[in-house]
Amino acid sequence: MKLMFVEARCKKPVFIGKHVLKLPEKIGLVTTVQFIGQVKEVKLQLEKEGKKVFFGKGKYAAYQAQVLGCDVDSAVSIEKKVDAFLYIGSGMFHPTAISLKTKKDVFTFNPLTNKFNKIDGKDVERINKRKKGALIKFLSSKEIGVIVTTKPGQEQLKKAFELKSKFKDKNFYFLIFNTIDFNQLENFPFIECFVNTACPRIALDDSIKLTKSIINLEDI
């Protein structure tokens, strides 16, 4: 089967305007492929107001400053150089991930609505508390369900199996899907806690779909 990757670009100019003054001196610029064509334009706007702008590149990204799916390495790679990040795009999926990974302030500018915001630290704190609670549940549980996907780029079966040697006092059940069906997980009522080895956002965004705690492999 032939695969074609077709980029959907937005051609609308991005003008940050007076919001530039709300940003600290050293800024890491990140965006999605939709606005990658406007990155240089935004960089010039920031530099005109005395800001120092940094780009990074993710493992799976095609361009500098690009975030792609769960990959926010373009931000992580420059986190020690910057005071905060500016995300150009819509939605909170990527900026929330950047905030969690880097512990830095993340400002957002939506070119479609011209709205400028800052990630609320309370939201991040709430997520971190949930993660700590899931870790406590994992450590105190004996029957563990390990969610594994067969999707390219997300499959971590080898790392999942390593849990058996690290936690010999627990029983692990490996549940393999392509697309995870949360209803099917309810067929294993004896499982006390789930470990997610697929997209890390599942444990954050989809935890409400489960009656049991779920923790990402990277958080153990």
Language-model regions, residue ranges each:
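Short glycine-rich anion-binding loops that position phosphate/pyrophosphate groups of nucleotides
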Residues: 90-93, 151-152, 199-202, 220
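Active-site regions of enzymes building and remodeling cell-envelope glycoconjugates
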Residues: 1-5, 51, 103-105, 172, ...
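A conserved acidic, glycine/proline-rich C-terminal tail/linker
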Residues: 175-179, 193-196
